[in-house]
Amino acid sequence: MRTLLRALPGIWLLSGGAIGAEFRFEAVSEKSLALWEGAKPVFVYNYRVIRKEGVPADRARSTYLHPVYGLDGEVLTDDFPKDHYHHRGLFWAWPHVKTGGKEYDLWMIKGAEQRFERWLVKEAGQKALLKVENGWYAGAKKIVQEQVTLEVHPAEADSRAIDIELVLTPLDQSVTLAGAEGKSYGGLTLRFAPRTNTVITTPLGNGQEDLPMTRLPWADLSAEFAGAKQASGAAIFVAPSHPDFPPMWLTRHYGVLCLGWPGVDARTFEPDKTIRLQYRVWIHRAAADAGRLKQAFSVYEKALATGR
C-alpha cells in the first residue's frame, strides 16, 4: 500500500516508488531546484542565497545541497544547525583562502562567498546530470571560477550513488587554500540531520573516537533518522585520482564528515591552473559495515576506471 509523505514545502509524494523511474528537475522556488526520481525526492540544490529567521544575517549561504534524502524519503542532512549555524547540508568550502595579500573564509562565509552564475547542463532521464558554474567572490571581485558537476545514478535496491566533481580555477592571482589548524577540515563536507544510534565507519574501524587529520579513502555515517523505519546513512568516497590520495579528514560523531584537502599544510595554486576533485556520495539503507563499504568503494573505483 502506498502512503502520502511530506517531502518539500507544498509538495507531497507517494511512498513505494518503483526502482527505474525516470528523473526530473522541479523548481522549489526562485532559489532552489529539486531532483526527483519518479515519486521520490533525491535532493534540493540551493543555488541562490538562503536565509533563516532567527539566525544571524551573516550566516546566509548558497551553493549547497539540502535536503539530501535517503531511499525511504528520510532527510539525511541538516541546515543552520544551532551548534554550527554555518554548516549547510552537503557543501564545499575552505576556512583559509588567501589571494592578493588578503585572507578570506568561505567556511564561515566571512569576506568571501560562493555565487551562482549559470546552468551549464541540466539533463534528466534514466540518470540525472546537473552542471553549474559558480564564482568565489570577495566583494565584487571574482577570485575563483567553480564548476560543479552532479551525476545521479538510478537507485538500486538498497543504495544510490551521486558522483560529484569540483573544478576550481584561480583567476587573476594565485590562491592559497588550507584547512583548519589541528583539525584539517576544508573541502567537501556532509552535515547530517538529528538522529540516534550514530556509527561512523572508516577503513580504521568504527570506534567512538573522532578522527582529526586522518588520511582515509572513505568514511560513512549510519544512524536512525526521523521518518525511516530502519537505519540508513551515507558515505563519501574519494576518487583515487584525487590530489594527495588519500586526503585528510575530520569525522565528528555529533554528525559531520569533513574532507580536509589540502589539509593543514597550505597549498598555492597559480592562475588559470585547474584543480579537479572527484567524489561519490553513496546513500544506503540499513547500517553499512566495513565489508559492504569496501565493496561499494570498489564499484566506484571500477566505474572511474571504465568511465561508466
Language-model-derived ranges and their functions:
Residues 45-48, 56-58, 155-201:
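Acidic (Asp/Glu-rich), glycine- and aromatic
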Residues 184-263, 268:
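Trp/Gly-enriched beta-strand surface patches
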Residues 21-86, 165, 178-180, 294:
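Beta-strand-rich N-terminal accessory domains
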Residues 7, 18-19:
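Cleavable N-terminal signal peptides
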Residues 85-158:
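Extended, loop-rich substrate-binding clefts of extracytoplasmic carbohydrate-active enzymes
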